[in-house]
Amino acid sequence: MIMFPTSTLFIEGCDLSGKTELIKKLHTTMDYKWHIYDRSQISRKAFNELYNRDIRNIKDDYNNEINNLNNRFVILVPTWKTIEKRFKKRGDEIHNILSLKDVYTKFEDVATSLSGLPNVFIPRYDQANIEDSVIMHLDTQEHSLSLSDISDQVFNAVTYSDELEIYSLSFMIYDDCQFEKADDTILTNEVEGEYYTKIMNSLLKKIDDELSGKNEYDRIESSKSRRFVYTDDSCISFIQVAVRDNVMDFHCVLRSSDVENTFQYDLKFLYFLASKCFDRLELESEEINKVRLRFNLNSAHTVQ
């Protein structure tokens, strides 16, 4: 079973939008399942623009946070009438009604501009229980997505970017060691099959050599070795397999990813390759409780 976990859940919106109340309800209902933050780099960037601040590295900070697809963002956009009513009832430590309207308008624009991102969710504000829709959305994201769904999210993130390139994009998935979606037919892919087979043979040979002591130290490595590595200057440029704390970590760096035409196949291949490494290391699911697959796409792009 594949899991696409939430690393950090950010609750966003203008002042008096209901962020604090939603966070309390999510924590209470889900028993603190998620690491939840009130505001993110989205707010920092919005206020930087609204108040003409000059915050160094803000673009990098913003991109690093939002281009990690395990970070998920909920943006609350109530009606202005709702905000105005709350202000009249309890006021605000910072804003008067005019400055509050400026912030509201800014966050309306922000929500519109980010609404197409795969890790941004904007719940309908006329629902009785917004927390239920957030919980349902996150449960779907974490437990019900296929590899194709995940590669679609990567594609959607890139096509939503101004330059049709994200440099860089990252995400992580877990598997329960059963690798139910591993499919060896990926090796017969018309375009990439030969390339995938070359990578697989190279990494598996490296693992075999290290386990049998065929290295410059004539030293037999264990399953916890740091030396199970594949490197190349092609698009899939780095893979490392390591076992730590009852987890098999499978880390991939792709120097260049055509998310429109090939990444969907790359992801299926790398998932399949992780299953082969698990078998080759003779790991048992009783000893290893999960497999963590980490992906760094240094240039996720569409062909232009």
Task: Give the label of every model feature segment.
Residues 28-74:
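Conserved nucleotide-sensing/catalytic segment adjacent to the nucleotide-binding pocket
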Residues 21-22:
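Hydrophobic positions on the alpha1 helix immediately C-terminal to the Walker A/P-loop
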Residues 1-3, 92, 105-146:
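NTP-dependent small-molecule kinase module
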Residues 14-15:
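The conserved Walker
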Residues 11:
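Hydrophobic anchor at the beta1->P-loop junction of P-loop NTPases
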Residues 136, 140-304:
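Terminal, non-catalytic protein-protein interaction segments that mediate quaternary/complex assembly
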Residues 67-112:
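A glycine- and Lys/Arg-enriched "phosphate-lid" helix/loop adjacent to the NTP-binding pocket
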Residues 18:
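Conserved glycine(s) of the Walker
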